[in-house]
């Protein structure tokens, strides 16, 4: 299908992407019409899909999509959850019309319906899960493209792209590859430069997994805040008041000034700052008990005070 052109050949990086996403892994059952798309069977019973034929059918599907003049006439459908995000991304990149979720029966055949559509091309993710739109497309002669596994029925399918349509990584990568080839064939992007859109944007994410990741991130943020609040001292506020007019006096905070008693003129600062000694009468009984008392000399002659109270010459009669 590449016609021997080097620009259309499958690159090594594309093969690595296919292998990493598990696109080459089929199912354990085999449909007789999908037999020529398989390479071999492993010992555990899983069929291996030939990626060379996957690439050729991918280019054929991209050429069929580019042949439609109005991109809105291309209808893409995925009833499985694994392909709904990829379908929306494909429609956003190429301008196609998307039906994600449940397909309303009669959309292609019942003209009385408000949601009646007449697409020129139909692309489905799984022929078994999306059998209703395939059946209705056969009634109104709409060509169909389907991503088929080894056990997928090929009834009403015009272009089958052999791949693993069960894994969400494989489905997202296949829609990403199809989007890139369509844009390259339209001339929107160049083949010489890699496409800046990552395949991760096409992968399905479980809502419970997203909720768990958000909860874990919130708990981590709360724990980090508690750790910082416990060990980090609060920052002091050193904001100074702004002075608009420097001619006005700046308010100075009140500072207690030490009061000195009168009569300290002519004294040094140390003498003035030292506490003055109060008179002995004012101290009362506040004596210094730590001082050593004077030792009396009992051998000395009695003093006048002793004579006043009486002594050897006192008359006690």
Swiss-Prot record:
A cellular component annotation (GO) from this entry: plasma membrane
Gene name of the encoded protein: rpsa
Bias-annotated ranges (Low complexity): 271-284
Subunit structure: Monomer (37LRP) and homodimer (67LR). Component of the small ribosomal subunit. Mature ribosomes consist of a small (40S) and a large (60S) subunit. The 40S subunit contains about 33 different proteins and 1 molecule of RNA (18S). The 60S subunit contains about 49 different proteins and 3 molecules of RNA (28S, 5.8S and 5S). Interacts with rps21. Interacts with several laminins including at least lamb1. Interacts with mdk.
Keyword field contains Cytoplasm: yes
Disulfide bond among keywords: no
Protein's UniProt name: Small ribosomal subunit protein uS2
Note: This protein appears to have acquired a second function as a laminin receptor specifically in the vertebrate lineage.
Positions of region (Laminin-binding): 161-180, 205-229, 242-317
Residues flagged as site, Cleavage: 115-116, 133-134
In-chain residues carrying the UniProt-annotated modification N-acetylserine: 2
GO molecular function terms attached to this record: laminin binding; laminin receptor activity; structural constituent of ribosome
Chief location: membrane
Cell compartment(s), UniProt: Cell membrane; Cytoplasm; Nucleus
SUPFAM superfamilies, per the entry: Ribosomal protein S2 (SSF52313)
Family statement: Belongs to the universal ribosomal protein uS2 family.
Post-translational modification remark: Acylated. Acylation may be a prerequisite for conversion of the monomeric 37 kDa laminin receptor precursor (37LRP) to the mature dimeric 67 kDa laminin receptor (67LR), and may provide a mechanism for membrane association.
Annotated region described as Disordered, given as residue ranges: 271-317
Pfam families xref list: 40S_SA_C, Ribosomal_S2
Role, per record: Required for the assembly and/or stability of the 40S ribosomal subunit. Required for the processing of the 20S rRNA-precursor to mature 18S rRNA in a late step of the maturation of 40S ribosomal subunits. Also functions as a cell surface receptor for laminin. Plays a role in cell adhesion to the basement membrane and in the consequent activation of signaling transduction pathways. May play a role in cell fate determination and tissue morphogenesis.
[DE]-W-[ST] repeat boundaries on the chain: 230-232, 245-247, 288-290, 297-299, 315-317
């Amino acid at each position: 299908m590449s016609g021997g052109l080097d620009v259309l050949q499958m690159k090594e990086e594309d093969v690595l992407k296919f292998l990493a996403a598990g696109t080459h892994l089929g199912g354990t059952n085999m449909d007789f019409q999908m037999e020529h798309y398989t390479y071999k069977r492993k010992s555990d019973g899983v069929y291996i899909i030939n990626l060379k034929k996957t690439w050729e059918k991918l280019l054929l599907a991209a050429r069929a999509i580019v042949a439609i003049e109005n991109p809105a006439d291309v209808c893409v459908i995925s009833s499985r959850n694994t392909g709904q995000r990829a379908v929306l991304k494909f429609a956003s990149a190429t301008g196609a019309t998307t039906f994600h979720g449940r397909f309303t029966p009669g959309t292609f055949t019942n003209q009385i319906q408000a949601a009646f559509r007449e697409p020129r091309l139909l692309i489905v993710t799984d022929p078994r899960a999306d059998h209703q739109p395939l059946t209705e497309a056969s009634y109104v002669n709409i060509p169909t493209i389907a991503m088929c596994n080894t056990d997928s029925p090929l009834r009403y399918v015009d272009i089958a792209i052999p791949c693993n349509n069960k894994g969400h990584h494989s489905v997202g990568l296949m829609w990403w590859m199809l989007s890139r080839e369509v844009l390259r064939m339209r001339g929107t992007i160049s083949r010489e430069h890699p496409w800046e859109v990552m395949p991760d944007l096409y992968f399905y994410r479980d809502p419970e997994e997203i909720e768990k990741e958000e909860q874990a991130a919130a708990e981590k943020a709360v724990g980090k805040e508690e750790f910082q609040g416990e060990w980090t001292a609060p920052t002091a506020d050193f904001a100074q008041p702004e002075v608009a007019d420097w001619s006005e006096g700046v308010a100075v905070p009140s500072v207690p000034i030490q009061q000195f008693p009168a009569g300290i003129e002519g004294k040094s600062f140390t003498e003035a700052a030292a506490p003055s000694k109060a008179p002995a009468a004012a101290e009362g009984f506040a004596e210094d008990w730590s001082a050593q008392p004077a030792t009396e000399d009992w051998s000395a002659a009695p003093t006048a005070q002793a004579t006043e109270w009486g002594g050897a010459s006192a008359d006690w009669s």
